[in-house]
Swiss-Prot record:
Keywords: Cytoplasm, Heme biosynthesis, Iron, Lyase, Metal-binding, Porphyrin biosynthesis. Catalyzes the ferrous insertion into protoporphyrin IX. It comes from Erwinia tasmaniensis (strain DSM 17950 / CFBP 7177 / CIP 109463 / NCPPB 4357 / Et1/99). Signal peptide: none annotated. GO terms for cellular component: cytoplasm. The lineage of its organism: Bacteria, Pseudomonadati, Pseudomonadota, Gammaproteobacteria, Enterobacterales. This is Ferrochelatase. PANTHER family: FERROCHELATASE, FERROCHELATASE, MITOCHONDRIAL. It is found in: Cytoplasm. Fe cation binds at H193, E274.
Amino acid sequence: MRQDKPGVLLVNLGTPDAPTTSAVKRYLKQFLSDKRVVDAPRWLWWPLLNFGILPIRSPRVSKLYASVWMDEGSPLMVYSQRQRNALAARLDMPVALGMSYGNPSLKSAIDSLMAEGVTRLIVLPLYPQFSCSTVAAVWDGITQVFAGYRSLPSVHFIRDYAQHPAYIAALKASVERSFAQHGKPDLLVTSFHGIPQRFADEGDDYPQRCYETFEALKASLGLGDDEAMLTFQSRFGREPWLMPYTDKTMESLPGKGVKHVQIMSPGFASDCLETLEEIDGENREIFLHAGGTRFEYIPALNDDEAHITMMLELVNQYR
């Protein structure tokens, strides 16, 4: 009789191995080559990526990574490893960390779990809100790895957790800590990573999941419609993305009398370039330059105890 041995695979997007041009170029090439991320025809996208985008963006992006790099490494990697370690300490089963792009790869993570005899795999993509460009890419990556296996484990794939009570409670606690430390702002802004509007039009329910998180958090905090808003960040390319845009919102708020904002990015399980540099750096500068007076960034949940407890609850559903 086959022994039942569960194991957990935590997955996040990924990060360059170092804040150098060569490492960033290698990472961006893998990331931007995924059709889930950029679905342009390959004959058009390949030369544009390799002869235009990568040579131009890699040196600039490497400097941005260097500005947020921690002593232990990339913030996303540091916090993801801490999450894995904390979860493993509270579970009596193997826990591995894999990245969709870069290292540790999904293959290395899955191989390590299979080598430990795992027969039932619990996959937790660390994306609270489903999107075809993130969670579906994890699904693709896992199936590609298992294409090389003769035997497969049972797989429990956690699609997302946008409204999970423990997730909302963890977000609420982080906002309340910020309010207690800095005072209640004129406006709480929740900034989610954007996707092309076309993806949503074609069936990706990501925007709905973001709004469901936002509404649940707003209700838990007892905030009115004029005290919190949702925006979308990190647009790339020329086609329309989900709106309102975070940077344009930060530019316009002071003119509407909003002088004090606190901003968080609930869609990021770990702080990374998009939160530390884009939100706490670029958007802070935009808001203050436009006439704002106070801007506070509320960190991602990272390895906060409430975040680990949430992960534990999600995993325990499938033990």
